[in-house]
Amino acid sequence: MNKGGPIIIIEDDLDDQETLSDVFKSLDYKNEIIFFSEGEKALEYLISTNVEPFIIFSDINMPRLSGMELRGKIHENEDLRLKSIPYLFFTTSAEQKHVVDAYSKSIQGFFVKPTDYTAIKEIIKTIVGYWQSCVSPNYIK
């Protein structure tokens, strides 16, 4: 986990992308915000880049490669796993099966996306603040 690295958002809904973009702009984080509408594109980026992201926010229901499948591929890839990138689901539904499956893949959080802008902003602020306070194995001096 690189606290100065980009925040990756994997979300196929353009309205949700726009809302999240507005939220992050209003919170004025210094991290670059990178959006992907497809899990496959996000995986290609994560595998090919030397940049270590700060955190990944992922939807679950996406075409081709779901958020759950993407998490599995990241977790199976030793190089990506060793980067200790927090992987969080930020999605519209919390079906029991999804929550259980997610935690069985060692995710670091499962959040239901609020419908209210202010509530989204507060939850993002809480999540980012939490991870900014955490220590990761890669950055212990």
Describe the residue ranges of each PLM region.
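Acidic, metal-coordinating helix/loop segments flanking the phosphotransfer/catalytic sites
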Residues: S21, F35-I55
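Conserved acidic segment of CheY-like receiver
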Residues: G4-D16, L20-F24
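C-terminal output helix
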Residues: T115-T126
